[in-house]
Amino acid sequence: MSTKGRGIFPFSKIKLMLASPDDIRSWSHGEVKRPETLNYRTLKPEKDGLFCAKIFGPTKDYECLCGKYRGKRYEGKICEKCGVEVTSSYVRRERFGHIELAAPVVHIWFLKSTPSKIGTLLNLTSRDVERVAYFESYLVIEYPNEEEEEKFEKEEGTIPLNDGISTKWVKLHVVNEEEFEEKYAFSIDEKYEYGMGAEILKEVLSKIDLEAYSKKLKELVKPYSLGFEDLGREVAEKYKNLYQKLVKVIADDFRAYGVELKGLEDKGLTLEQAIHRIITEELYLNVETGEVEFEDCGDNCLTGREALRVYYEKVREHKRDIPIFEKIKEDVRTAVLREVSEARIRKALRILQLVEGFKKSGNRPEWMILEVLPVIPPELRPLVALDGGRFATSDLNDLYRRVINRNNRLKRLIELSAPDIIIRNEKRMLQEAVDALIDNGKRGNPVKQNGRPLKSLADYLKGKQGRFRQNLLGKRVDYSGRSVIVVGPELQMHQCGLPKIMALELFKPFVYRRLEEKGYATSIKHAKKLVEQKTPEVWECLEEVVKQHPVLLNRAPTLHRPSIQAFEPVLVEGKAIQLHPLVCPPFNADFDGDQMAVHVPLGIEAQLESYILMLSTQNILSPAHGKPLTMPSQDMVLGTYYMTHDPIPGRKGEGKAFTSYEEVIKALELGHVDIHAKIKFKVGKEWIETTPGRVLFNSIMPEGQPFVNETLDKKRLSKLITNLYIAVGNEETVKFLDRVKELGFLRSTLAGISIGIDDLQVPKVKEKIIKEALKKTEEIWNQYVQGIITNKERYNRIIDVWSEATNAVSKAMFEEIEHSTEIRNGKEYPGTFNPIYMMAVSGARGNRDQIRQLAGMRGLMAKHSGEFIETPIISNFREGLSVLEYFISTYGARKGLADTALKTAFAGYLTRRLVDVAQDITITEKDCGTVKGFEMEPIVEAGEERVPLKDRIFGRVLAEDVKDPYTGEVIAKRNEVVDEKLAERIARAGIEKVKVRSPLTCEAKHGVCAMCYGWDLSQRKIVSVGEAVGIIAAQSIGEPGTQLTMRTFHIGGAATAQKVQSFVKTESEGTVKFYNVKFIVNRKGEKINVSKDAAIGVLDEKGRLLERHTIPYGARLLVDEGQKVKAGTKLADWDPFNTYIIAEVGGKIELRDIILDVTVREERDVITGKTATVVSFMRPKDAMLHTPRIAVITEDGKEYVYDLPVNAILNIPADKLTLEWRICPTCSESEETTIQHQYYVVKELEVQPGDILARIPKETAKVRDIVGGLPRVEELFEARKPKNPAILSEIDGYVKIYEDADEVIVFNPRTGETKKYAIKKDELILVRHGQYIKKGQKITETKVAEIDGQVRIKGRGFKVIVYNPETGLQREYFVPKGKFLLVKEGDYVKAGDPLTDGTPVPEEILRIKGIEELEKFLLKEVQMVYKLQGVDINDKHFEIIIRQMLKKVRIIDPGDSRFLVGEEVDKEELEEEIQRIKLEGGKLPKAEPVLVGITRAALSTRSWISAASFQETTRVLTDASVEGKIDELRGLKENVIIGNLIPAGTGVDEYKEVDVIPAEEKVLEEKPQSSEEETS
């Protein structure tokens, strides 16, 4: 280890290794031979026992056991009588003992962890090794005789053993007793060795020749990093099987792209043989003509793999295609990688990794078997005497006693040379005893005592109660206390009230010192006495000590950084801590019995840091989004709102003019003017109209700020505070906040606002609205009864009607309140002074929804499943609920409480994973100098802009110059920080994309650089080096999750359905532009959109895009392209409840495979008696045999076929439909008998373009809350595959859709003749199901119809082919039935576009579109979940987590690196290795990025200490010890665990050199009241 330490330790790295038996003996101070602990009479430790003083040290300080030597002067002496060394009893916490085991024992971690390390190394299954270790089976080693040596070496699964002379490859067999007796027991052949138990395993492990093993395995996996460039004779000879597969891949590609080799037939060669012989340089290829020659024929004749490439590109050029040879290279590589994923190769790679681990680390395999067992120091497994003569002991002592007892018994049996079977049994029991000690319950049943499993060594490490999480990461500290909090409105913002008795206890040592200094006490003892008596001098000293000494307050749960802040204590009477009301929001504290903890920072550095960094006045802004956290709330907001309210006409003092604040305030106090009167006031040189209340508010504003002349509610107040912070800085803002608090409280008190039941005004129109709604629902029921709409539609429409009614009542209620007047205190007030209204509108308490429930109507309630209960609650709380209504509403209320309990845990666990994955990301340097960046654009969802560009680039550093797109002038330069002004300017210039620097593209070696991170949002300046941005990111994402889950029950389950959007309106004036709009005109002359990705934009006169709206398929367009529109014009509307299948051409209709009770069912509604024909397959088999479709046949005989997905409802008039019995050829054929079905047939029916053929009802409306959202966040961060994945196109190209089936049947209904055609896997079917074809028409490229007839296809689904004529690339996708296709024949798609519905799989996006698109996708998806909840989190926090998910790469070709093919390594490690190989000159490794979920990323971090303390402790430690992993102690977690300063904040190396010189007392006294220092 290097001696240069980190923090307080003389080392900078920690390496984990396996301990050899000699290591264990060297740690030990003696062997423990007896299981005894303490003597029951003398209570002294027994000699040679588990607590032996001779081995572990004296029980009393500086005193031997027999008492002969006592006192410090004998230190180091060993007593002759009892053999105990005289020293401090502390050594009993650090001295080890050991137990010499009578027989070797397998360490269970290396036997039972998955995959088993010993099993992997010996190439045996875990179960086999276990059977050997527990004496159930024999391990037989088969050595080769001389003839077999070479054969054994080549065979897979053999193992090299070195007996000290030579290395032989042997086979291992695990056989049971019977087989052993039969085959090997009496064999005189010398080639077999055998044994049982850990002994034989140890023997084999100690002989393994790691070098030879590694060499063989490397040879085995070497071909799997081959590419086209490596093909040649050597490869052909060495790796026959793989090579043949690759030749076939090349041949297939040549055929597919029409590249022919000529002259093969005369020479009797197949294409594969020719390619093979060209690659191995046995044949020549004329690259001009394509002739294959036996001899060299001059310049044009080439041989080897290059010949194929040159010829291929020449041919493609003649065909006017782009000559892409990359495609063949890619296919070869894909074929190789497919082989890698084979189990055999994966296994070889796993063994190789383990062998390399042992080689590199210097561990020996036989050390996984224990000969000596260490005994941990006795003070770490204490035995405590309780009163009543009983003892409480650690479980470990019991486990050790079992081991010692069994070990001693085994020794005795071996000395007595007992029968083999007894010894074997005893050895097995010893093995089990050691297993229980190391990891109880890992194998078989755990050892129990009084029905409770004993805690083994592993249990002391793992889980929440283990050493890592309980004692190392979550220590309890002294100088702390906790108490209930109460509000302290008279405090200043940097103060808190600390109870005197509490302060006295916390500051005791300081008080003692002060008492001595002032001469009140002569000694510490005296001072103690004074403090106990609590004399007046004590309180005097306490006051002095506490002054200027900050304390930290913390409220659990500590969800983010502002949950711990520093305050200056003010001593108060009583026992409750007083908290300033403004700092409640960051703590999320209220005063209904919350408790808080107090901590005292002791050191001078700690006090300074508390003052400068943690003081509450320094934490006004949130690190998550940069908006103020410290906010006036409740009464303060109400008071401010009340006094800045609009003027009331006709009040006392109206029209008076004032010139100064003092005049107004005096007039107000004397009652000459009413607070809401309209007065004139002089601001600067201008006169303005305002009210005395607003003048009063402006009198507390910082100087030089513009006059605020508006009604201030919570939102405006927040905006005002943000603007002030920008304008006047921290200190002035804090002072202002304190003044707002005072004034707000005062004014709300003087206003005397209170609420009475009369303030809840039930709107007069409520009855009318409800009558109308009831009428509408009745109509909907009638339509349903008549069968015009389906049950699902009925449900959706009813929900919609009630949502609208609820909103209407609520709107009416607020309007009535606003327009009414009331007499209060003899004065007339407008309705906006209604106290409840004021509370809601100002944002002081409650919201419109809650008032709606109090005085409007409660509205719709949600069920557990998230659906709405159809019957709304019509009453409100003022009128009271009926029994039924009360019963319905218990539903939602209970759901709220149940959710809260479950989801808090879920969100907490998510936060923990996020912290663990990002904990080691800190700001490590000022600027990494990268030129890369991340493109920011507005987030648009469903056609509306959810997050504007200016919000996304705010606080970021530009990656390149930003130019005005119209004038070309440079608005901002690279590396400039974007503040509000600049963001606004960029947005105004109409720029749509801006490249900013991002943690995702940062090139800092460890962590992130300050420029790529941008602003520290809580300080509004570039982040300082050392900031722990990873943890801040995790907290910023996790905290709202926890908050949101806690928020559901406040509305009491009264759900609000999101109003369904059924049209789009313009927001601005301009000219209409269509994007991808394809429309047809229907019978009514309306334009119907039939494009799947259409959008309508509005441009201004310069042609700049102002807005863009997506338009769904089937929408009615209400404007024309190029039309001028005003703001508020409707552009398009559609039916929000259904998706339509629309006839795009006119013609006759034919139904195909629409068979009653087979492919469609008649849904007859019990209530309505009407029927609807709905597509649904009765049996899964039917879906294979039939494909329901509607065909429209035009006059010129062209067919347009529309597939009907499941749940589609036919839209054909009932009188045009008849049922006919017909023979079904497909079913008859599959059941091998004649089967008839009832087919639906359409009588003469012509459709016009735009007619609706069928409709698919949409999913029902559900309540969307983050609870639905949190699992989505988890799905994204864990990189899980979504439940319904979308199929994405991998290339750009045109879509072709074919049926996918094994056979095509042509059936002639007139003659009854049937012909079958078997279809090969790679053939494309050129006809559609149900189509009528003529004899001679092609069915596939090779098969032709032999009869006229109708086509029948037993379809599995579709083959969707994307073909790119330019590159010649083609990809095919299988789409199963029931998945909805988003593309049509002939559509053009881009790589990464979805072909079917569903959620895109992140890994697919990474593979197809690359890392940048994936980053954009993840960022947008996860932001949307939070945005739907109205939660603001800055992008950079998500970016840091996404950076961690993408920090690994998978090695495709190891080159000359130390990596293996398929291994996943950190980008950093790969970079280091590349640099090394560049210096030495060798083949560089190639890798591809992989996406890793946060749990896996946290477990595979380079720091084993951090991973072990996260999850799966056993596995992490086992892996780390075998590989001899080194922890560099870079992250925060590992440093906390070993007790070091963390490498963040002031713990960064840069600050190491800074020393704090304790100033004289005098200087300390003059410290300023509130913190004015800026962060250094």
UniProtKB/Swiss-Prot annotation:
<dbReference type="Pfam" id="PF04983">
    <property type="entry name" value="RNA_pol_Rpb1_3"/>
</dbReference>
<dbReference type="GO" id="GO:0006351">
    <property type="term" value="P:DNA-templated transcription"/>
</dbReference>
<feature type="binding site">
    <location>
        <position position="928"/>
    </location>
    <ligand>
        <name>Zn(2+) 2</name>
    </ligand>
</feature>
<dbReference type="Pfam" id="PF04998">
    <property type="entry name" value="RNA_pol_Rpb1_5"/>
</dbReference>
<feature type="binding site">
    <location>
        <position position="592"/>
    </location>
    <ligand>
        <name>Mg(2+)</name>
    </ligand>
</feature>
<dbReference type="Pfam" id="PF04997">
    <property type="entry name" value="RNA_pol_Rpb1_1"/>
</dbReference>
<keyword id="KW-0460">Magnesium</keyword>
<dbReference type="GO" id="GO:0003677">
    <property type="term" value="F:DNA binding"/>
</dbReference>
<feature type="binding site">
    <location>
        <position position="590"/>
    </location>
    <ligand>
        <name>Mg(2+)</name>
    </ligand>
</feature>
<dbReference type="InterPro" id="IPR000722">
    <property type="entry name" value="RNA_pol_asu"/>
</dbReference>
<comment type="similarity">
    <text>Belongs to the RNA polymerase beta' chain family.</text>
</comment>
<dbReference type="Pfam" id="PF00623">
    <property type="entry name" value="RNA_pol_Rpb1_2"/>
</dbReference>
<keyword id="KW-0808">Transferase</keyword>
<dbReference type="InterPro" id="IPR007081">
    <property type="entry name" value="RNA_pol_Rpb1_5"/>
</dbReference>
<dbReference type="Pfam" id="PF05000">
    <property type="entry name" value="RNA_pol_Rpb1_4"/>
</dbReference>
<dbReference type="InterPro" id="IPR006592">
    <property type="entry name" value="RNA_pol_N"/>
</dbReference>
<keyword id="KW-0862">Zinc</keyword>
<feature type="binding site">
    <location>
        <position position="64"/>
    </location>
    <ligand>
        <name>Zn(2+) 1</name>
    </ligand>
</feature>
<feature type="binding site">
    <location>
        <position position="66"/>
    </location>
    <ligand>
        <name>Zn(2+) 1</name>
    </ligand>
</feature>
<dbReference type="InterPro" id="IPR042102">
    <property type="entry name" value="RNA_pol_Rpb1_3_sf"/>
</dbReference>
<dbReference type="InterPro" id="IPR012754">
    <property type="entry name" value="DNA-dir_RpoC_beta_prime_bact"/>
</dbReference>
<feature type="binding site">
    <location>
        <position position="594"/>
    </location>
    <ligand>
        <name>Mg(2+)</name>
    </ligand>
</feature>
<keyword id="KW-0240">DNA-directed RNA polymerase</keyword>
<keyword id="KW-0804">Transcription</keyword>
<dbReference type="InterPro" id="IPR038120">
    <property type="entry name" value="Rpb1_funnel_sf"/>
</dbReference>
<dbReference type="InterPro" id="IPR044893">
    <property type="entry name" value="RNA_pol_Rpb1_clamp_domain"/>
</dbReference>
<feature type="binding site">
    <location>
        <position position="1002"/>
    </location>
    <ligand>
        <name>Zn(2+) 2</name>
    </ligand>
</feature>
<dbReference type="GO" id="GO:0000428">
    <property type="term" value="C:DNA-directed RNA polymerase complex"/>
</dbReference>
<dbReference type="InterPro" id="IPR011054">
    <property type="entry name" value="Rudment_hybrid_motif"/>
</dbReference>
<feature type="binding site">
    <location>
        <position position="1009"/>
    </location>
    <ligand>
        <name>Zn(2+) 2</name>
    </ligand>
</feature>
<dbReference type="InterPro" id="IPR007083">
    <property type="entry name" value="RNA_pol_Rpb1_4"/>
</dbReference>
<keyword id="KW-0479">Metal-binding</keyword>
<comment type="function">
    <text>DNA-dependent RNA polymerase catalyzes the transcription of DNA into RNA using the four ribonucleoside triphosphates as substrates.</text>
</comment>
<feature type="binding site">
    <location>
        <position position="1012"/>
    </location>
    <ligand>
        <name>Zn(2+) 2</name>
    </ligand>
</feature>
<dbReference type="InterPro" id="IPR007066">
    <property type="entry name" value="RNA_pol_Rpb1_3"/>
</dbReference>
<dbReference type="InterPro" id="IPR007080">
    <property type="entry name" value="RNA_pol_Rpb1_1"/>
</dbReference>
<dbReference type="GO" id="GO:0008270">
    <property type="term" value="F:zinc ion binding"/>
</dbReference>
<keyword id="KW-0548">Nucleotidyltransferase</keyword>
<feature type="binding site">
    <location>
        <position position="79"/>
    </location>
    <ligand>
        <name>Zn(2+) 1</name>
    </ligand>
</feature>
<feature type="binding site">
    <location>
        <position position="82"/>
    </location>
    <ligand>
        <name>Zn(2+) 1</name>
    </ligand>
</feature>
<dbReference type="GO" id="GO:0000287">
    <property type="term" value="F:magnesium ion binding"/>
</dbReference>
<dbReference type="GO" id="GO:0003899">
    <property type="term" value="F:DNA-directed RNA polymerase activity"/>
</dbReference>
